[in-house]
A protein has these predicted regions:
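Beta-strand-enriched, solvent-exposed domains that form extended recognition/catalytic surfaces
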Residues: 1-56
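N-terminal cap/lid segment of alpha/beta-hydrolase-fold proteins
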Residues: 6, 75-122
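Low-complexity, Pro/Ser/Thr- and charge-rich linker/hinge segments at domain boundaries
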Residues: 50-84
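Short beta-strand-to-loop junctions in surface cap/lid or active-site-entrance loops
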Residues: 106, 113-124, 132-137, 143-146
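Cap/lid segment of the alpha/beta-hydrolase catalytic domain
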Residues: 137-198, 255-262
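Alpha/beta-hydrolase fold nucleophile elbow
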Residues: 213-223
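Hydrolase active-site cap/lid region
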Residues: 227-275
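The feature captures the conserved acid-bearing segment of alpha/beta-hydrolase catalytic domains
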Residues: 258-314
Length: 314
């Protein structure tokens, strides 16, 4: 995907080959090996880190970044949540009630849907918001964590119920919502992720209104796209007290322009060099800029060999 330093064919002696490499700047150097055996192709790769603790984001942070999102959330909160909850009796356990829920986000009729799991025993509980990776799918809810004594809310981001048959979501992924992460990315307020980020924050509003929530401990977690949303939510809502971001996506979009790995969805690698407006807009949706606003403890993970959410971008 990114600049190749050396590419060559080799013939192994005694089944071994030793390679040497170095870097002059902080980053990750990857070795990818392809072997052709008969009519099959085998691939393997290994990635080495060079002073990764010295990596700094390339993306620029708009001067009004935080102010912009504070105002957008204030505007969204003028729309009442109007929550709806339906008990899913077939999913309930001896200790947990499971609900299909929805609530309004940024305008009348625009809803987030999810699966809420609440311990049956009377009391006040901590809460965990689970935000999704990229794609369109149904959700079962995090019953396991609820059985350990926490409220859990697992949300979808596309404004559709999350308890339909898989074929329903497949049709959307292959049709109207195909490539949704690119929609209106040159429009600051109509970019697809605007509603998504606001929706994740309204999910926190929803949790905080639950009578069973203890008002003290509220976490958010997810992987890839969900890792990004975890950082974004924790950065913008002070009621979030901790987060866990698993290989977060949407990081350091501008890195591509400096020939450095950027995060999924690799806007400028796959979809062409940006015009001035697009570059301006995506800075407001860059996980790296949200991370600058974090003030609560978090747990991160990433994979050196990950070429979807490269570690350089995190």
């Amino acid at each position: 995907m990114y600049p190749t330093e050396v590419k060559k064919g080799v013939l192994l002696k005694n089944g071994e080959l030793k390679l040497q490499g170095t870097m002059k700047t902080p980053g990750f150097l990857r070795c990818k090996v392809t072997a052709h055996v008969g009519d099959r192709k085998y691939e393997g790769l290994a990635t080495a880190a060079y002073a990764p603790e010295q990596l700094q984001p390339i993306t620029e942070c708009p001067a009004d970044f935080r102010e912009f999102w504070v105002k957008e959330l204030e505007g969204a909160r003028r729309t009442s949540l109007q929550p709806l909850m339906t008990l899913l009796s077939e999913r309930c356990t001896a200790t947990v009630n499971v609900y299909h829920v929805s609530f309004q986000t940024d305008r009348w009729g625009s809803r987030f849907y999810g699966v809420l799991c609440v311990p049956k025993k009377e009391g006040k509980y901590p809460a965990l918001l689970r935000v999704p990776g990229a794609g369109i799918r149904p959700y079962a809810g995090d019953v396991y964590t609820a059985e350990q004594g926490a409220i859990t809310l697992e949300v979808g981001i596309h404004g559709i119920p999350v308890t339909m048959e898989q074929s329903f979501y497949d049709n959307l992924m292959n049709g109207a919502l195909n490539g949704y992460w690119t929609f209106c990315r040159n429009d600051l307020r109509n970019f697809y992720y605007h509603r998504v980020i606001i929706g994740a924050l309204r999910a926190v509003d929803f949790i905080c209104e639950l009578p069973q929530y203890n008002g003290q401990a509220l976490g958010v977690t997810g992987s890839s796209q969900g890792g990004a949303l975890s950082v974004m939510t924790a950065a913008l809502d002070p009621r979030v007290t901790f987060f866990a971001a698993v290989h977060p996506a949407l990081c350091d979009h501008e890195a591509f322009m400096k020939k450095r790995a950027c995060g999924w969805p690799h806007y400028f690698y796959y979809y062409g060099a940006p015009d001035a407006k697009e570059l301006e807009v995506v800075r407001y949706y860059d996980t790296a800029n949200f991370a600058r606003c974090l003030a609560v403890p978090g747990w991160f993970s990433w994979g050196y060999n990950d070429d979807v959410c490269p570690p350089t971008s995190m």
